[in-house]
Amino acid sequence: MKLELFQTIYENNIISKTKDIFEFQPDEGRENQIINLYPEIEYQAIEGFGGAVTEAVGQVYSLMNEKQRQEMIHEYFGKEIMKYCMVRIPIDSCDFSVSHYEADSDEKDEKLENFSFLRVEKFILPVLDAAEKEHGKRIPIMLSPWSPPSFMKANRKRNQGGKLKEKYAGRWAEYICRYIEEFRNRGYLVAMLTMQNEPKAVQPWDSCVYTPTEQKVFLKEYLYPALKEHNLTDIEIYLWDHNKERAYEWVKEMLDDEIRDMVAGVAVHWYSGDHFEAVRILKEQYPWLKILTSEACIEYTKFSNVTTLRNAQKYAHDLIGNINQGMNGFLDWNILLNEEGGPCLLYTSPSP
């Protein structure tokens, strides 16, 4: 048996690559450099890697020529290179949308009769179709809302945080189920769901804030019953969907015996630092829960003076650190943006 060792070193703006081949030898009991394999010892299963398909991604994709589209899709979802096998898609608009929008903004439409999937069909599905064709099979989708429709919120706006009004909690649960069904009725594999992107953050873009108790009530009394009524309980629900350093506190306060069987995992972001110990604590305290990084990107405002390769090193650092502590998968943010890091409702950031 042979071991191939690949090393890429970046130092003083110089890239050096090495490849070494080592022959395995029988273990003769000597104290030496050795690789021990213990088949009975297992760690976490790796669910896979992927990225987000937002309206911004779809808009840029629509402006590319066919050759550019094929090259991009092949690099991400082909079998030889990055091998992406998951995607994250926003429910309604997010910060990386062409404009604010809602599938149904009619406050009087209690039965969602005016629900429109046209924006998803225009911007999201062409990218998803190309990805699945390249991948060779259906790609598991994680859906995440940034905000309920404006009329359902106390501040009557999609942005600037605000809270979901209790009287609309049931309707918001039905709205989420409708989104899932729109995808599934077209044959797409919605497999994962988070209840709210960054539930502690009051953002100048689409956002909505919850406490752990509020989210627990929403899940237990509204969302899960709605999923059950629509035969959608096979979907994996992920808690949190925010930065790593507060993940354990949120899960500890929210998770109890009443909702334990409703929850499959915890979704985390990377924007506040490494916090690899937070991943380890989650895995130690809740070993049955999966841990996915659901969003990560390099923000221009923080890293504008470093090279592209240095940014790649940040990804490698985060991936290795998280996987070593028990992470099950990684979803990058936008897989494609324009040269200005958009389109975006407020600011820009680079895509991989």
Q: Where are the regions that the model predicts?
A:
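N-terminal catalytic cores of secreted or lumenal carbohydrate-active enzymes
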Residues: K19-V190
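Structural recognition of the beta-strand scaffold that forms the well-ordered cores
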Residues: G48-V53, C85-P90, P140-L143, A191-M195, ...
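Active-site beta-loop-alpha junctions enriched in small/polar residues
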Residues: T54-A56, D92-C94, W146-P148, M195-K200, ...
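Short acidic/His/Gly/Ser-rich catalytic and metal-binding motifs that mark active-site loops
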Residues: F96-H100, P149-R156, K200-P204, A247-E249, ...
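Active-site-proximal loop/short-helix segments
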Residues: W146-R158, A191-Q215
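Active-site neighborhood of glycoside hydrolase catalytic domains
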Residues: N185-R186, D206-E299
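Catalytic-core region of carbohydrate-active enzymes that cleave or remodel glycosidic bonds
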Residues: V268-E340
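Conserved small/polar residues in nucleotide/adenosyl-binding loops
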Residues: Y347-P352
